[in-house]
Amino acid sequence: MGKKAIQFGGGNIGRGFVAEFLHEAGYEVVFVDVMDAVVSALQTTPSYNVTEVSKDGENTKTISNYRAINSKTNESDAVKEIATADVVTCAVGPNILKFIAPLIAKGIDARTESKPVAVIACENAIGATDTLHGFIKEHTPKDRLDTLYDRARFANSAIDRIVPNQPPNSGLNVRIEKFYEWAVEQTPFGSFGHPDIPAIHWVDNLEPYIERKLFTVNTGHATTAYYGHLRGKKMIADALADDEIRSMVHKVLDETASLIVSKHGIPEDEQKEYVDTIIGRMSNPYLEDNIERVGRAPLRKLSRKERFIGPASQLAERGQKFDALVDAIEMALRFQNVPGDQESADLAQILKQKSSEDATSELTGLEKDHPLYSPVLERVAKVQQDTK
C-alpha cells in the first residue's frame, strides 16, 4: 500500500502549501473539510495547479492523487481514513483545532497499525500541535489514554509561506510565494523515525524557529498592514514602498531581533539577514498581497502570545526596548470596522463599550502588574479618545 496523508482544511494553505509537499513526497492526500463547495470541487476536479511566484518569475506545478471527504456528512469515512493513515496534518486556523479534535481522536482510537500516525498541525501559532493534542486527549476514552502514544505521535511545526488573496475564478488553483520554511520537531517520533517528507526541516528544538518566524514574519507582515491601512494603502508592497512605513517596520523588527538574538543565541548578523529577506519577500509586488487580508482578525493578533504582545511582553520582562512594538499595537487597535472582518467590528465594540483597563485586559491578556500593561493601557485610552 502507498503512503497516505490526511489534510484537514482544503483552503489555500492546505492545497497550496501542505498538500503540495505531501504530494511531492509521494503521499496520496485525503482532504477533510466541512465546506460543501470546497469538498465538491476537490471531488470533481482530478488535479489543480500551484503557481510559485518570485521576483524571477513563475513556476507552476500540478497536484493530483488526492480525494476529499466532507466530515460534516461523512464522519465515519473520515474516521476510517485516519485509522489507516501515515500522517495527519491540518491548516484550519488555531481557533478551529478544538472542532477537528474529536474526529481525529476517533480515528486514532480506531487504529490497528503497528506504527503510530504522525500528527502535525500547520498553523500560525506557537505549540499548535500541543494544543490539538490536548483537545484529542479530552476526546479519548480514559482507559485508552495510557496507550495513545502507541497509536499517534504529535510534533509541533513552524510554517512560513505567504499565500496572498487569490485572483477571481481561480477554482482550486493557488498562487503562492516560492519561498517557504517548514520546520518540525523530530524528537517525538523516537525509534519509529519521522515521516519521509523532503520539504520538512526536522529539528530537535523548534522554539527558536517558531519564535523567529512568528516575531519576524508575522509581526512584520501585520505591522505593515496596520500602518498601511491607516495611510490608505491597498497592497503590502505599496505600503513598504512608503519610506516612513518601511522605517517603522524596520524599527519593530529591530526590537524583535534583539529578543531572538538574546533569548535563542541566534547570531546578530544571521537575524539581520533573515529580517532583510523577510522585508524583501513582503515587498514583492507580484504577490499582490492585500492589506485587509493581512490585517484581518486583529483580536487574535493582539492576544497574549501572538505577534505583538508576545515579543513586547518578553522584551519588557527582560528590560529591553519595546517602543516601536507599542506603536504597532496602537496601529492594530485602529484596525476597526473593516468590511468582511468580524473581529475588526468586535474590536471597535470592545473599545467603545469598555473601560480602558477592562479593554486592555480583555484584548491583551496582560496582568495589571506586568511591565507592558501600562504602556499598552495608555495606547488603548488614546485610541478610545480618538474614536469617540
Swiss-Prot record:
Protein name: Mannitol-1-phosphate 5-dehydrogenase
UniProt family annotation: Belongs to the mannitol dehydrogenase family.
E.C. designation(s): 1.1.1.17
Family matches, as InterPro entries: 6-PGluconate_DH-like_C_sf, 6PGD_dom2, Mannitol_1_phos_5_DH, Mannitol_DH, Mannitol_DH_C, Mannitol_DH_N, NAD(P)-bd_dom_sf
GO CC terms: cytosol
Top EC class of this enzyme: oxidoreductase
Any one Gene Ontology BP term: mannitol catabolic process
Keywords from the UniProt entry: NAD, Oxidoreductase
Species lineage: Eukaryota, Fungi, Dikarya, Ascomycota, Pezizomycotina
Organism (species): Aspergillus terreus (strain NIH 2624 / FGSC A1156)
Subunit composition and interactions: Monomer.
Residues that coordinate or bind NAD(+): 5-16
